[in-house]
Amino acid sequence: SYVFDQATLKPKFEKASDVMTSIIPKNIRANVPVLPKEDKRKIVFGKDYNRLSKPASMAKLINYALLDIMLQYDNALIFGEDVAKKGGVYHITAGLYEQFSIRRVFNSPLDETSILGFASGLAHNGFLPIPEIQFLAYFHNAEDQLRGEAATLSFFSKSQYTNPMI
């Protein structure tokens, strides 16, 4: 097959950068969005704005980080099982649905493989997907989307596609 033939003809990897060469995106986003103004953050964070520098649970800190990402990147989407109105099983996404609407924070079907496949497809179409898998045990059902699809995309497409997932 073509893929096998190409793999056997390539020089052996000698350093870590050789391994990464084919998956580094050819077109890195030139214009990184500017950070949101403090006035806007103050409005969006509401009563939590004054708590940002105080100790908090990891769940709350991740929620703050997601809020900042959603403010900075208008192409960011959060989705998974019960992440919208419910705010996720650990309330990581609490309040994000109300701030950013169903267009950017939405529930997915109860199918982890589809969630990660959807994330990969969205990333290839210019979005910054933030998928949530509720529990590690559920991730194992879907890990092939990362290991077998996303991680090998550049190689199997003859470098026509790169892996834009984070």
What are the language-model segments listed below?
Residues 17-166:
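Thiamine diphosphate
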Residues 1-18:
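Active-site or pore-adjacent capping/gating segments
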